[in-house]
């Protein structure tokens, strides 16, 4: 099974995810974001809401990929198309390798035109956070950051990972 994994609720990412969903009509779509309007964008574009799963527990790239890890493993996916920004793809790729290992069936689908140089050092730090999670199962974050980010995402969607038992 092919999976389209959209990291975050950025409107341009949604547009790219929708294009992929139309090109791969049998693929499931996993949107890892607290932006609940994403599902509506997909359904407005004619994508069956039964194909879409919302992960509303993630608050950054590391949690995007660690929260969806179990789901994607259970779905026995043969390939995962990761939809993200071009400047974000370097970080997302590093974190994907830390979470899934080098054998990951992932393909980055970035859009945009430039790379943010500040993102490189941040990406390396997040790589080690993800690697620590992969080795120990522990996510390490400042408590105040986690609480601040989690307070933004209080609602749940019909197709959330929480309701699916993940």
Where are the model-predicted features located?
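A transmembrane-helix-recognition feature enriched in membrane-embedded lipid enzymes
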Residues: 118-146
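A structural signal for short, hydrophobic/glycine-enriched beta-strand patches
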Residues: 1-126
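The feature marks non-catalytic terminal segments
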Residues: 139-166
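A general structural signal for short secondary-structure boundary/capping elements
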Residues: 100, 127-134, 151-159
């Amino acid at each position: 099974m092919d999976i389209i994994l959209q990291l975050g609720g950025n409107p341009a990412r949604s547009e790219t995810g929708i294009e992929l969903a139309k090109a791969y009509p049998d693929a499931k779509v996993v949107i890892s974001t607290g932006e609940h309007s994403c599902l509506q964008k997909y359904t407005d574009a004619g994508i069956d809401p039964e194909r879409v799963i919302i992960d509303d527990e993630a608050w950054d790239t590391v949690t995007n990929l660690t929260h969806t890890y179990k789901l994607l493993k259970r779905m026995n996916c043969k390939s995962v198309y990761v939809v993200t920004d071009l400047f974000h793809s370097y970080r997302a790729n590093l974190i994907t390798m830390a979470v899934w290992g080098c054998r990951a069936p992932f393909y980055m689908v970035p859009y945009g035109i430039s790379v943010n140089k500040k993102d490189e050092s941040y990406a390396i730090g997040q790589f080690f956070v993800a690697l620590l999670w992969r080795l120990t199962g522990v996510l390490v974050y400042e408590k105040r950051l986690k609480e601040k980010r989690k307070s933004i995402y209080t609602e749940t969607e019909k197709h959330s990972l929480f309701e699916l038992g993940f």
